[in-house]
Amino acid sequence: MDKSIREFGKRMDTAEDKLVLVDYAEGFKSILDLGAGTGKISRDIAEKCGAHVDAVDLEFKDNCQNSELITYYSQDINTFLSTTKNKYDCIVLSAILHELSDEYIHQMFSNIQDIMLPNCRIIIREPFVDDILGPVLPKDLSRFIELVKNNLPAGKAIEFAQTPKLNSGKPLNINDFVGIDWINFCFTISYGEASWEREKKELRYARSLNWCKEFFNFSKRPFTGFQILPILDKTYKKHFINANLPAEAFDLIQYTGMLVIIDYSEIEK
């Protein structure tokens, strides 16, 4: 089967745009939402598709309450994938790859292959920052493409969307950032005040488990616009040399997104 990448023409770069992926979950009955967060997408899928959704994240299940169609698992993703007995015909990953190291993603995709039903569909939505931000974040699009191509079996097609968007804010000076290994830099994007509060809670929780480090007291900052919360994975010894970074440094200026749809008629390992 061809594993081609082609222009898809859908916007995947804002909070509203991510709901496009709900359309691609229609027709499936056993759906897994990895990195579900508040459960907003899980609920939208369950209500629109009438399907049962298993939602997996460390916590924050606001929108999954009182829904008979959603089962929420407060677990690490790879822990869940390696222990669950459930099988799924649709697996959703919305905006989680940028929070994970390459090694974690490799293991996650390997685990996913063990829980796929025949004719399974994998839906991956991913926002990422454009070149205007320089090397402080994983700006190279090929990282996401190669992670998918190299760690998942071939499917019917891989569909890819890229849409630049200009936001208000100040351009960054890449000289403000020194000594950062940006290839494996982990970050999380917040689109609104509610998600910003959730991201801060998640950061504090991860920090309490010694999974990451926090810089510039981000967990105490109010929401001031479309923002990036920097997280450093504990497996990499990274640090900021310039400690006088301006507050505006993590306000996003330009960003893009991608949507990947992979359909399987049979699973090849």
Indicate where each model-derived feature is located.
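Conserved class I S-adenosyl-L-methionine
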Residues: 29-37, 123-150
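Short catalytic micro-motifs in class I SAM-dependent methyltransferases
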Residues: 95-96
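A conserved beta-strand element that flanks and buttresses the S-adenosyl-L-methionine
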Residues: 92
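A short glycine-rich, Lys/Arg-flanked "PGG" loop and its adjoining helix->strand segment in the class I
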Residues: 106-118
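Class I SAM-dependent methyltransferase Rossmann-like catalytic core
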Residues: 1-18
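Conserved Class I S-adenosyl-L-methionine
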Residues: 201, 205-207, 215, 219-265
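Class I SAM-dependent methyltransferase SAM/SAH-binding core
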Residues: 38-79
